[in-house]
């Protein structure tokens, strides 16, 4: 029997087999249920008011109304139900997926293929994690709207005390210790642990130096978050930017191209030997690690296929480690929304070296996992909301360029 607290999922795909496969994934996950199934976007639009889903899983290629057309109608009708794209790994699928993100889709997962393959198990876990993350956030948003309309307190169902910490391995063991600071004080506050929480206090080895590079790590929720930030970065930002976004192979080139359309800086997928220079943003290629090397005359990017770190390739920790090694106290490390702990350990190293560090705050994260672990380690100098992140980067870049 369906629980009213379940996250209701609408599956939109023209393949009966795919609807069945994904339906089994949803039905097999605790806390999730199927709101309905539709064979194209037109049927999905007709069903929305009746089934009231919390998340929509949307195929791209469908007759009568495809994924792009559905998103265009969703935008026109001002429907804010989160949409997760079910994408193929083909080049054309990657291009259309990025167009979907531009139209307001929240995120994407690659379509399952095969029946008992490791890929199917991996994708199934990702579908469940993404649906849970976006669905819980939307349910809270909808509940908050109802309570505000009735002028009553917002109540969360039992077990949803912290809707942002959805990392399946760590959600029970990582109480939040990052104290929120007033806006006027955010640049200088100290992080204090909550009652009973453990936290390592890091004492930097040296004072922060002149800022020479900005490194960003992000996972779940990252595509739309980075688009939001990059659209607001100043064209005269003095430092180069390097980014790890957890993303499969075949998508990052189109992702970088999409970001380049909205950013005043040059955004490109990193290639071996690329110059890391002012006016440029380098995105780690899917399924490859990105590192930087500071030489006497220039800083260059390196790409490798070493083993995954923290279960990820590209890994934020791998990038941050190289930044800490070559730039010591002259970097800005930023850890944003995402499951797990990738990036937290090496953000702590950056902080220890004297570099400046920022974590996205809990309220604006789709999943408050990676930033939360960094806070537990005492590695965060400032918490910043997504809406304030671009302005903060612009401010850091200019104020600390010659400190």
From Swiss-Prot:
KW ATP-binding (keyword) present: no
Occurrences of domain Response regulatory (ranges): 8-126
PROSITE patterns named in the record: CHEB (PS50122), RESPONSE_REGULATORY (PS50110)
Record GO biological process: chemotaxis
EC id: 3.1.1.61, 3.5.1.44
GO cellular component terms given for this protein: cytoplasm
Residues at the active site: 219, 246, 342
GO MF entries: phosphorelay response regulator activity; protein-glutamate methylesterase activity; protein-glutamine glutaminase activity
Post-translational modification 4-aspartylphosphate, affected residues: 59
Primary localization class, coarse: cytoplasm
Protein's cellular compartments: Cytoplasm
Catalytic activity: [protein]-L-glutamate 5-O-methyl ester + H2O = L-glutamyl-[protein] + methanol + H(+); L-glutaminyl-[protein] + H2O = L-glutamyl-[protein] + NH4(+)
Processing and modification events after translation: Phosphorylated by CheA. Phosphorylation of the N-terminal regulatory domain activates the methylesterase activity.
Keywords in alphabetical order: Chemotaxis, Cytoplasm, Hydrolase, Phosphoprotein
Top EC class, one word: hydrolase
Domain CheB-type methylesterase: 204-393
UniProt domain comment: Contains a C-terminal catalytic domain, and an N-terminal region which modulates catalytic activity.
Family: Belongs to the CheB family.
Summary of the function given for this chain in its UniProt record: Involved in chemotaxis. Part of a chemotaxis signal transduction system that modulates chemotaxis in response to various stimuli. Catalyzes the demethylation of specific methylglutamate residues introduced into the chemoreceptors (methyl-accepting chemotaxis proteins or MCP) by CheR. Also mediates the irreversible deamidation of specific glutamine residues to glutamic acid.
Name of the protein in question: Protein-glutamate methylesterase/protein-glutamine glutaminase
Name of encoding gene: cheB
């Amino acid at each position: 029997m369906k629980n009213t607290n379940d996250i209701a999922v609408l599956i939109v795909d023209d393949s009966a087999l795919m609807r069945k496969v994904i339906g089994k994934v949803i039905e097999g996950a605790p806390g999730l249920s199927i709101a309905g199934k539709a064979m194209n976007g037109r049927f999905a639009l007709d069903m929305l008011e009746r089934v009231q889903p919390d998340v929509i899983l949307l195929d791209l290629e469908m007759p009568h109304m495809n994924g792009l057309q559905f998103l265009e109608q969703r935008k026109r009708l001002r429907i804010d139900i989160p949409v997760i794209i079910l994408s193929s790994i083909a080049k054309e699928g990657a291009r259309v997926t990025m167009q979907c993100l531009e139209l307001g889709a929240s995120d994407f997962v690659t379509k399952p293929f095969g029946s008992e393959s490791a890929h199917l198990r991996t994708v199934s876990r990702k579908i469940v994690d993404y649906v849970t993350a976006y669905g819980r956030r939307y349910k809270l948003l909808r509940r908050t709207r109802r309570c505000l309309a009735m002028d009553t307190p917002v109540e969360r169902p039992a077990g949803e005390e912290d809707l942002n910490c959805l990392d399946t391995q760590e959600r029970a063991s990582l109480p939040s210790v990052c104290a929120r600071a007033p806006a006027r004080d955010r640049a200088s506050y100290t992080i204090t642990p909550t009652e009973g929480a453990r936290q390592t206090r890091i004492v930097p080895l040296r004072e922060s130096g002149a800022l020479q590079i900005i490194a960003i790590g992000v996972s779940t929720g990252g595509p739309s978050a980075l688009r939001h930030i990059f659209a607001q970065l100043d064209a005269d930002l003095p430092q180069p930017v390097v980014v790890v976004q957890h993303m499969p192979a075949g998508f990052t080139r189109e992702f970088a191209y999409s970001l380049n359309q909205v950013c005043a800086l040059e955004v490109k997928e990193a290639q071996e030997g690329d110059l890391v220079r002012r006016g440029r943003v380098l995105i780690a290629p899917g399924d490859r690690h990105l590192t930087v090397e500071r030489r006497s005359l220039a800083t260059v990017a390196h790409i490798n296929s070493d083993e995954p770190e923290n279960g990820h390739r590209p890994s934020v920790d791998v990038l941050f480690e190289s930044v800490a090694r070559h730039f010591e106290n002259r970097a800005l490390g930023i850890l944003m929304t995402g499951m797990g702990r990738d990036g937290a350990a090496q953000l702590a190293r950056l902080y220890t070296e004297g570099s400046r560090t920022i974590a996205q705050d809990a309220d604006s994260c789709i999943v408050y996992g990676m930033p939360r672990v960094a806070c537990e380690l005492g590695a965060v100098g400032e918490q910043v909301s997504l809406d304030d992140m671009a302005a903060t980067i612009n401010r850091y870049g200019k104020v600390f360029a010659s400190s």
